[in-house]
């Protein structure tokens, strides 16, 4: 646990010094969500119905913007080889990278999402579902995204390949995340969707770091 904490602190320091990836993700998230009503119309009855889905789709895309660089800097300067030989292990490194990615990107998306929900006239009774689904879902994006980042490390046009690999894996998160918001708007119970997202998160925590480590060893 001490090694994990030190690695998370290291990754947060690197992310904060770089800074631009997280900022670009949030700016993209806000701009893309703001642009959608111009394309689909501003019907007050329609916007709440599509708002949850749009926010989740844009969040998926925004979270992917910085995934390509998750391991790239360590690979380029040789740090990844040293970490591979260290007692900490690549699985712990992968978990630390995912946690740092979520803290610098996912948390910002989580904060911005309720503000954007106001743009879509999402009812106040659905805000809890929005926050809960994002709180459970966005860490999954970082954990699963780490697998794609490891598989495409050093590849030409890695960003395109990363999107092709990861987007299909994000679909269940999108379905249940947006479904929780729609259920809250319609007055239906949202516990089933949140429980499924919680199960996905536990599975990702258990499996994704080690799958990422296996990909890094190749």
Where are these regions (language model features)?
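Membrane-interfacial helix-loop-helix connectors in multipass membrane proteins
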Residues: 39-50, 114-135, 181-194
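Hydrophobic alpha-helical transmembrane segments of multi-pass membrane transport/permease proteins
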Residues: 19-41, 56-59, 165-176, 202-207
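Aromatic- and glycine-rich beta-strand/loop motifs that create alpha-glucan
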Residues: 1-25
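Long, hydrophobic alpha-helical segments
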Residues: 51-67, 71
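Hydrophobic alpha-helical transmembrane segments that constitute the membrane-spanning cores
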Residues: 27, 95-120, 140, 144, ...
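Junction motif at the cytosolic side of a transmembrane helix
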Residues: 202-218
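Transmembrane helix boundary and interhelical loop/hinge segments in multi-pass membrane proteins
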Residues: 64-84
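A structural motif at transmembrane helix-loop-helix junctions in multipass membrane proteins
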Residues: 128, 133-167, 217-218
């Amino acid at each position: 646990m001490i090694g994990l904490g030190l690695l998370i602190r290291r990754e947060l320091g690197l992310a904060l010094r770089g800074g631009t990836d997280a900022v670009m993700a949030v700016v993209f998230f806000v701009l893309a969500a703001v642009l959608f009503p111009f394309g689909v119309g501003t019907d007050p009855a329609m916007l709440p119905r599509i708002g949850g889905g749009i926010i989740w789709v844009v969040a998926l895309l925004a979270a992917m913007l910085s995934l390509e660089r998750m391991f790239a800097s360590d690979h380029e300067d040789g740090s990844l080889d040293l970490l591979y030989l260290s007692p900490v292990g690549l699985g712990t490194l992968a978990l630390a990278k995912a946690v740092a990615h979520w803290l610098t990107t996912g948390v910002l998306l989580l904060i911005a999402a309720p503000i954007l929900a106001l743009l879509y006239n999402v009812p106040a009774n659905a805000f809890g579902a929005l926050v809960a689904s994002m709180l459970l879902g966005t860490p999954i994006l970082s954990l699963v995204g780490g697998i794609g980042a490891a598989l495409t490390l050093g590849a030409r046009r890695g960003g395109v390949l990363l999107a092709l690999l990861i987007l299909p894996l994000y679909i269940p998160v999108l379905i249940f995340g947006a479904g929780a918001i729609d259920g809250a708007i319609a007055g239906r119970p949202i516990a089933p969707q949140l429980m499924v997202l919680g199960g996905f998160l536990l599975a990702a925590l258990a499996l994704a770091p080690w799958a990422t480590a296996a990909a890094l060893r190749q």
